[in-house]
């Protein structure tokens, strides 16, 4: 795909150049044998997106917004809306594209607001976001001054959603690759690595933490957000078949247990900068998804519990240095 060739050209002349030893072969294999059955339809939808005045105002500092509501006539606006809805479900956002409000399931801006004041200045930094979804936070990282932003997520619909937004922003230092963390070599090249909402999906959280550490420069910063439970340093919840209707949830540590894991893996200066119970105004059903959302995952008679009887989702943000 053309976008990957552009990425190769970019990293050939920067500190990520050694990634070229493995990445092209991985993405070539992905493109030849692992494409989703709907991928060609998504690509046609992407190709049909309108080309709007390149001088449109772009704001990725305070939100992710391109242009204004008067940029398109009624017919153009409706066509844009119909095309973007072909990429449903939209999980993470929101986005504002020429007056179109993509009201995603998650208000990912809430999470950004919780962490932004605690992280190191991103100005001039190389940043990696692992499990980045459709890339909402990639744009906010760029808006915060990052020099080069890379997101990885193996879900192909997220790649197409990212490409749809990038069609209107076209900010070349922001990239999304359809990879899982296990496919990354030890790059040791990023100043800041974000891993938000991923750890509890990993069968081996300790291996995952080592994988994160292997992407950071010496002294680089890890920003990790994950589900937690109350308890001491020995408290870890291992749910049964499902947690909040999710099948792939493996480990929910306490704050102290998570800190101990990070320290055991060689991170230092470990601290918790925020804890927050996920609220119904942060994750909810909208017209941009066709599935259930948080309200459906909680006990209808006791919102402090999941429908399975576990503690309701509570998240913490940890920051540490490699």
Swiss-Prot record:
UniProt keyword Acetylation, yes or no: no
Q: Which reaction does it catalyse?
A: carboxy-S-adenosyl-L-methionine + 5-hydroxyuridine(34) in tRNA = 5-carboxymethoxyuridine(34) in tRNA + S-adenosyl-L-homocysteine + H(+)
What EC class does the entry list?
transferase
Q: Does the keyword tRNA processing apply?
A: yes
What Pfam family does this protein match (any one)?
Answer: Methyltransf_9
The residue stretches assigned to a coiled coil in this entry are none
The alphabetized UniProt keywords are:
Transferase, tRNA processing
Q: Which residues bind carboxy-S-adenosyl-L-methionine?
A: 92, 106, 111, 131, 153-155, 181-182, 196, 200, 315
In short, the EC number is 2.5.1.-
Q: Name one GO molecular function term.
A: methyltransferase activity
Q: Which domain of life is it from?
A: Bacteria
- Known InterPro entries for this protein? CmoB (IPR010017), Mo5U34_MeTrfas-like (IPR027555), SAM-dependent_MTases_sf (IPR029063)
Biological process GO terms, please? tRNA wobble uridine modification
Q: What does this protein do?
A: Catalyzes carboxymethyl transfer from carboxy-S-adenosyl-L-methionine (Cx-SAM) to 5-hydroxyuridine (ho5U) to form 5-carboxymethoxyuridine (cmo5U) at position 34 in tRNAs.
User: PANTHER family from the entry?
Assistant: METHYLTRANSFERASE, TRNA U34 CARBOXYMETHYLTRANSFERASE
The family classification in the record reads:
Belongs to the class I-like SAM-binding methyltransferase superfamily. CmoB family.
Q: How does it assemble?
A: Homotetramer.
- Entry protein name: tRNA U34 carboxymethyltransferase
What does the record give as the organism's lineage?
Bacteria, Pseudomonadati, Pseudomonadota, Gammaproteobacteria, Alteromonadales
């Amino acid at each position: 795909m053309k976008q990957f060739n552009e990425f190769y050209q970019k990293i050939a002349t920067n500190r990520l150049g050694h990634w070229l030893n493995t990445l092209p072969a991985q993405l070539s294999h992905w493109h030849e044998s692992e494409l989703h059955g709907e991928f060609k339809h998504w690509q046609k939808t992407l190709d049909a997106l309108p080309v709007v005045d390149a001088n449109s105002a772009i704001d990725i500092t305070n939100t992710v917004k391109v242009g204004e509501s008067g940029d398109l006539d009624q017919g153009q606006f409706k066509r844009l809306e119909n095309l973007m809805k072909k990429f449903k479900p939209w999980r993470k956002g929101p986005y504002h594209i020429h007056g179109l409000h993509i009201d995603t399931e998650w208000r990912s801006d809430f999470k950004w607001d919780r962490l932004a004041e605690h992280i190191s200045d991103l100005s001039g930094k190389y940043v990696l976001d692992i499990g980045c979804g459709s890339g909402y936070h990639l744009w906010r990282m760029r808006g915060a001054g990052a020099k080069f932003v890379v997101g990885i997520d193996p879900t192909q619909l997220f790649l197409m959603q990212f490409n749809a937004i990038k069609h209107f922003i076209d900010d070349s230092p922001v990239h999304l690759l359809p990879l899982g963390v296990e496919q990354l070599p030890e790059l040791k090249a990023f100043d800041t690595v974000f891993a938000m909402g991923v750890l509890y999906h990993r069968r081996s959280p300790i291996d995952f933490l080592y994988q994160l550490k292997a992407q950071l420069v010496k002294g680089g910063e890890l920003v990790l957000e994950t589900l937690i439970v109350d308890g001491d340093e020995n408290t870890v919840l291992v749910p049964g078949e499902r947690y909040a209707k999710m099948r792939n949830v493996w480990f929910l540590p306490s704050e102290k247990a998570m800190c101990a894991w990070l320290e055991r893996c060689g991170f230092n200066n470990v601290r918790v900068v925020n804890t927050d119970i996920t609220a119904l105004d942060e994750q909810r059903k909208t017209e941009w998804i066709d599935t259930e959302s948080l309200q459906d995952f909680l006990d209808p008679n006791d919102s402090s519990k999941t429908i399975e009887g576990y503690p309701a989702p509570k998240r913490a943000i940890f920051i540490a240095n490699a």
